[in-house]
Amino acid sequence: MKLKLALLAGAAPAAALYGAPRPVQIIPSVLPADFAALGLDCTALEKAGCDRIQFDVMDGNFVPNLTFGPDVIAAQRKTTKLMFETQLMVSERCTDAMLPQFTEATKGPNGEPGVVIVHVEACTHIHRSLSNIRAMGGSPSVALNPSTPAEAVENVLDLVDHVLVMTVNPGFGGQAYIPTMTDKIEKIRKWIVDRGLDVDIEVDGCVKIKSSRRLRAESLRRPPRHRRDACSMAWRYRFLTVRPRRRREMTW
């Protein structure tokens, strides 16, 4: 089974981070799903109890793969009431030109802000891109590749709701977790906690039971268990701790 896991550690007080295990969300990526039955798959995910659906958008330029555009994402709104999350793994020209369409397509069933993730490597003016997402009614979030230092996002932490740390090179599944990314995650988490920001950290890429142990130990004390019953297909899962205000809670 292919897994795409993310551990999300919000900027709660330090005592909460190091204390009892925090609740988690399960957010599957539909990248490995059957595109011919994507709507049925999204409906199945909602019935399985998932909290949000993640779409990996690739343009064949920024990463060596090609997936779907905003119309495909928007069409899935008819099949589920779950919130969406869109990660734009696309070139700068595509990011700037398509932000309005993707932000609109990612919104919830009642116009709630959907999570729109842009890569810091693809945005010369990252402040402007993130501010535009917020102004257009989205939830601005930033991602950084393994080769990008944590300092690249330090000056935009006050503009985002999430920071996504890629622990493999984006584009294809089946890659090994890069161990040095754990230190990067810890550095970003420390900045968030020290500043008292309400920002979550997502960890994306081959986060399996072994690699998750250290991540959970540093931010949540305990590693997550593997949820095999959430979906029968070889979809990639995201395990995220959530902020206390969110509706569903599960402890691990």
PLM ranges: what are they?
Residues D59-T67, D71-V72, L82, P146, ...:
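Glycine/Thr-rich beta-alpha phosphate-binding loop at enzyme active sites
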Residues I133-A135, L197:
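Structural preference for solvent-exposed beta-strand-turn elements
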Residues C42, R93-A105, T148-L159, C206-R221, ...:
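Catalytic cores of alpha/beta
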Residues K2-A15:
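Cleavable N-terminal signal peptides of Sec/SRP-targeted secreted and luminal proteins
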Residues L17-V115, E121-C123, N132, P140, ...:
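Conserved N-terminal beta1-alpha1 strand-loop-helix module at the mouth
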Residues L38, L45, D56, F102, ...:
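Conserved, mostly hydrophobic/aromatic
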Residues V24-S29, I53-F55, Q76, F84-L88, ...:
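Hydrophobic faces of well-ordered beta-strands that scaffold small-molecule active sites
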